[in-house]
Curated annotation (Swiss-Prot):
Name of the featured protein: Holo-[acyl-carrier-protein] synthase
Protein residues bound to Mg(2+): 8, 50
Enzyme class, spelled out: transferase
Keyword Lipid biosynthesis: yes
Recorded coiled-coil stretches: none
Length: 119
């Protein structure tokens, strides 16, 4: 059963300017393994994290570090979650998180669907 849906779009150039103006932004938003990725990939991961927050109902008090976008052996993206994000997901009955990301024409987009059992 679908528990939540979230989508987000990020302007890659605007994200790059923000990261350049604010040196602490990338370390605050991303796990160590994510930080060395190209700007377009970071923008897509930021969109993914925003989309996950929306799919979970906009929980406050989370740490960006509680969400990491990882890729499996086939290159498909997914989330590793911990801390407050994992607690909110469990409290809302979320047992699976689906993620799709893309970047093209200066925009990064992410779409998240959360699933769980029951009503």
């Amino acid at each position: 059963m679908i528990r939540g849906i979230g989508v987000d779009v990020v302007d890659v150039a605007r994200f790059a300017r923000s990261a350049e103006r604010t040196p602490g932004l990338v370390p605050r938003l991303f796990a160590p393994a994510e930080r060395s990725l190209p700007t377009r990939s970071l923008a897509a991961r930021f969109a993914a994290k925003e989309a996950l927050i929306k799919a979970l109902g906009g929980p406050g008090g989370i740490s960006w570090q509680d969400m990491e976008v990882v890729r499996d052996a086939h290159g498909d993206p997914s989330f590793q979650v911990g801390g407050a994000v994992a607690r909110v997901a469990a409290a809302r009955g979320v047992t699976r998180i689906h993620l799709s990301m893309s970047h093209d024409a200066g925009l990064a987009t992410a779409f998240v669907v959360t699933e769980g059992e029951g009503a």
